[in-house]
């Protein structure tokens, strides 16, 4: 069903990546790649190989690994050292399965697992460096996942960008350290959203074919008639923030940095976002 739809859409639609979706099966209740049971690890790899085959059919070389259950529900149940090595080994096997595939790690600090073993983009970059082919292992930053880790999404994105490893991004928002809410982009922290867009624009993100995704969910009160509003709103906010970035006064920014007038720079940014003159 998917491939004919892509062909019919032509250049308007493409498959960015395929994901093994390991968090939904009883085999992976206690992890897939990091499971204490060899049969579960074999199942996780089987789904990963199958995802690579599907990706090839759909014309993409990218596999995104959201490590949803790769960690511990009981801290004493697993060795973080052995578990990390299991993940590296699993990625190496995927790299060996297809010499062209790219593996993209999407980190998250918790939920549905209690304690993730690869919780931030820094962890993902370290895993990448430890594989047999680091050039084919990158990262995906989701805004809400960074916030759940108590980190700034733009800093997480910038860290991966500096290493040439930010191969996709998922924009959304999050109200503090709760469950993963996947709120519409910018609804909780507009300034934080602005800085994510600013970072991507400044670094010409997308020039090499990278995608910017909107990983957002509708509110539970949303009617079927309004079922796409969360997507429409998120896209509208992202585009509006692009316009704000285009108006950002970098000369004034530099002046404030040179004099360490961060109060002035902060207020300038707020005025820009609120549309206040002066």
Language-model regions: role of each:
Residues 1, 15-20, 194, 198:
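Metal-cofactor-binding active-site regions of metalloenzymes
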Residues 1, 23-28:
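Short active-site-adjacent helix-start/loop capping segments
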Residues 1-10:
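Basic, amphipathic N-terminal segments that precede the first structured/catalytic domain
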Residues 9-11, 15-17, 26-138, 266-268:
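Active-site acidic/histidine proton-transfer and metal-coordination neighborhood
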Residues 19-24, 67-71, 107-111, 143-147, ...:
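Active-site-proximal loop/turn and secondary-structure-junction residues that shape catalytic pockets
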Residues 53, 89-93, 97-102, 117-278:
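Histidine-acidic metal/acid-base catalytic patches
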């Amino acid at each position: 069903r998917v491939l004919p739809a892509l062909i019919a859409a032509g250049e308007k639609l493409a498959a960015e990546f395929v994901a093994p979706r390991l968090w939904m099966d009883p085999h992976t209740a206690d992890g897939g790649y990091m499971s204490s049971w060899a049969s579960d690890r074999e199942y996780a790899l089987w789904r990963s190989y199958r995802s690579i085959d599907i990706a090839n059919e759909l014309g993409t070389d990218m596999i995104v690994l959201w490590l949803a259950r790769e960690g511990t529900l009981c801290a004493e149940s697993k060795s973080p050292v052995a578990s990390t090595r299991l993940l590296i080994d699993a990625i190496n096997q995927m790299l060996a399965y297809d010499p062209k595939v790219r593996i993209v790690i999407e980190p998250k600090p918790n939920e549905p697992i209690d304690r993730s073993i690869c919780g931030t983009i820094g962890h993902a970059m370290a895993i990448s460096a430890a594989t047999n082919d680091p050039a084919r292992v990158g990262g995906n930053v989701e805004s809400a996942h960074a916030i759940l880790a108590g980190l700034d999404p733009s800093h997480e994105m910038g860290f991966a960008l500096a290493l040439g490893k930010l191969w996709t991004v998922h924009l959304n928002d999050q109200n503090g350290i709760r469950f993963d809410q996947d709120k519409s982009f910018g609804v909780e922290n507009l300034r934080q959203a602005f800085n994510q867009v600013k970072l991507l624009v400044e670094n010409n993100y997308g020039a090499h074919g990278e995608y910017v995704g909107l990983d957002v969910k509708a509110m539970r009160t949303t009617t079927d008639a309004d079922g796409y509003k969360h997507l429409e709103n998120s896209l509208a906010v992202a585009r509006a923030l692009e316009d704000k970035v285009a108006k950002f006064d970098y000369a004034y920014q530099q002046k404030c940095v040179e004099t360490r007038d961060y109060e002035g720079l902060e207020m300038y940014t707020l005025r820009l976002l609120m549309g206040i003159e002066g």
